[in-house]
Amino acid sequence: LRTRRLWVQVLPGVHMSIENQLGAVSHEDWMRRALSIASKGMREDEVPIGAIIVYKNKIIGQGYNQCESLNDSTAHAEMLAITAASNTIGDWRLTDCSLYVTKEPCSMCAGAIINSRIDALYFGCYDEDFGACGSKLDICGNPTFKTPSVVRGNVLGGDSLVLIQDYFFKKRKKI
């Protein structure tokens, strides 16, 4: 296998290099980017969940949880990434886009994913308490809705889980 450097646009005017084999950006590569964004949230004392939206090998939207800093229960990583992506392309319909998020989306975010017409969802760790894409509920797999054609969990799920567990361990230690 050949390894080569691939430059991808992560935001307008911002590029990053991804080392990959055979020139393909893997789901794990994209999830690593979402994990990096989640880490930024952790540094800002937010629950470390990060999300990116990819269209034609470019990140067109990203976000991390900001519920605490914005005093907004809807400021989840997925919601902020969807808003950013919609603003980037000038359309609320995110057809042919993939969402990478470090934790299984909740019911609110699953509804937004369906409503925004996102084609593929890849998430890190499962959420047995609030997950709505296979754990507690399966909104994204419900044939009643026009759901994403691909829903895949456990993409670097262990890394996502460790990040979240580390955050809550440190929070409890402060108390």
Model-inferred region functions:
Residues 16-44, 105-175:
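Zinc-dependent deaminase
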Residues 45-49, 95:
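Short, basic and Ser/Thr-rich N-terminal targeting/leader segments
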Residues 34, 38-41, 51, 61, ...:
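Small-residue (primarily alanine) positions within well-ordered alpha-helices
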Residues 49-57:
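Short beta-strand scaffold segments in enzyme catalytic cores
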Residues 71, 75, 79-116:
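Helix-adjacent hinge/juxtasegments
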Residues 2-5:
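Basic polycationic patches enriched in arginine
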Residues 60-67:
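Short beta->alpha transition motifs characteristic of CBS
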